[in-house]
Amino acid sequence: VLVPRPESELLVELALAALRARSREVPEPRILDVGTGSGALAIVLALEMPAARVSAVDVSSAALEIAARNARAHGVFGRIALLRSDLDAELPPGRRFDAIVANLPYVPRGALAPSPDPTSFEPRLALDGGPDGLAVYRRLLACTPDRLAAGGTLVMEAAPPTAAPLAALARAAFAEAAEVRIVPDLAGLERAIVAQLGGTGTPGANANGP
């Protein structure tokens, strides 16, 4: 799996801020971690928001096994629904979430170091973002508008050079229904893209279960 990096903490902080701002309206939010890998983001979100119903998906069975072990070690295994899925493909139709976090492969294929780089110890699947680093995110944005509940928030991690193009893709995907912004990390580099849907409504509308 991809080794968790400090930059990814920003995704958790942004998701928590958005959810806490709506805590009265949505006291038991549904959260989806797409491409969960080791489960780090889902676990922290579950720990920080005990009332939340957290789902975590990954295309890799091996990654989900690691995520399950980590969730058990942190005492939240029973509160995270782990599912093998290519993005949202295996999620029940109509299930929506109040927050979606995604740290998907975003390294341009040509920039992947063959060796001996630390990335060589991580599966290529967890790094390869296609020719421009945005291939997987394009697929995510094709389905996300149908997965966010009213007022929901999508938080995505990107490489600084692709943050602006990814933000543009998000604006196009939501057809101006969402406020999209780029948030820098502690080093001042453009790192996270946040898409905030307008409107209010039932959390996780038309969804059942965790």
Features from the language model and the residues they span:
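Conserved SAM/SAH cofactor-binding pocket of Class I
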Residues: 10-116
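C-terminal lobe and adjacent flexible extensions of AdoMet/dcAdoMet transferase-like proteins
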Residues: 192-210
